Design a protein with these regions (language model features):
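Double-stranded beta-helix
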Residues: 21, 154, 166-224, 249
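Extracellular structured ligand-interaction cores
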Residues: 28, 137, 155-159, 171, ...
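Short helix-to-loop capping/linker segments positioned immediately adjacent to catalytic or ligand/cofactor-binding
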Residues: 93, 112-114, 146-151, 161-164, ...
């Protein structure tokens, strides 16, 4: 595993040619200090309010997408995976619609849009490593698997990760295999066992991020989240993911069926 094996960038009013070229070659890019500490705290507070509401009301799904519940280090019920967060949080919605996110659409062909109401919407993942946790790590996968299961053409997409906590090897951390976003369909389907394979890859790169950093990856790239070697509160890792997509507009509603690929999410622990 390689650490600090890539440059980090500053996000300006528009992307530079150097930044676009780096993303095109590697399939990911890391921007430092995109969100302020105040913005991060506001977003975290809003997710805690959402969590309290969903637990109180016993909500199981949002627009057909299951909510992943579990326990924290104090054995309290928590939400590990929040779907469609921006529909319930003004703070998240405002950040998602800010110019910082809008400018990233230039990494995709014309017609790219932020999918607040499509797929799983804006996701917040809350990892914590305790014996009772349902969300300690996530095995190798590509985000494009969803399109494959529905028999759709695999189109380029972005997953924009805003880090709400510091995240390095001590938290497990995101691992990506640079350049795999250009792989053929066979390798996308069969190179690794989706979610079940959590083994280290000799070509993987550790994403070492601070709270407020933003890491953008192509949906076709192989990536995983490793399990923290630490037990308890110090293992906490929260990341908000914003999808930017192409193709036909397909919004989700309360009547939407549960997508088939979510059966695989049961393998994620």
């Amino acid at each position: 595993m390689k650490k600090e094996a890539y440059p980090k960038f500053a996000l300006g009013d528009s992307l530079t040619s150097e930044q676009s070229d780096f993303f095109k070659k590697n399939g990911f890019i890391h921007f430092e200090g995109v969100a302020s500490a105040q913005e991060i705290q506001s977003i975290i507070a809003s997710t805690e309010r959402i969590q309290e509401r969903w637990l109180r009301e016993g909500v199981k799904k949002i627009n057909g997408v299951p909510i992943k519940y579990g326990k924290d280090e104090n054995n309290k019920d928590i939400v590990h995976r929040f779907p469609f967060t921006s529909q319930y949080s003004e703070e998240v919605h405002n950040f998602v619609q800010s110019a910082r996110i809008q400018n990233l659409k230039s990494l995709l062909p014309p017609g790219a849009r932020i999918a607040e109401n499509e797929k799983d919407g804006v996701i917040v993942n809350h990892y914590v490593n305790i014996p009772e946790s349902n969300f300690r790590q996530m095995g190798w996968h590509t985000d494009s698997m969803r399109d494959i299961f529905y028999g759709k053409k695999v189109l380029p997409m972005l997953n924009v990760g805003l880090y709400l906590d510091n995240s390095s090897a001590d938290k497990g951390g995101l691992r990506v295999i640079p350049g795999t976003h250009t792989q053929n369909m066979f390798n996308m389907l069969f190179k690794k066992a989706y979610f079940m394979n959590t083994d280290e890859d000799k070509s993987e790169v550790l994403v070492d991020a601070k709270a407020g950093d933003m890491v953008v990856h192509d949906g076709r790239i192989w990536h995983r989240v490793a399990q923290s070697p630490i037990i308890g509160a110090l293992s906490r890792r929260r990341v908000m993911y914003i999808p930017i997509i192409l193709g036909k507009y397909m919004p989700k509603t309360n009547d939407s069926a549960t997508p088939f690929y979510h059966h695989f999410m049961k393998l994620v622990r």
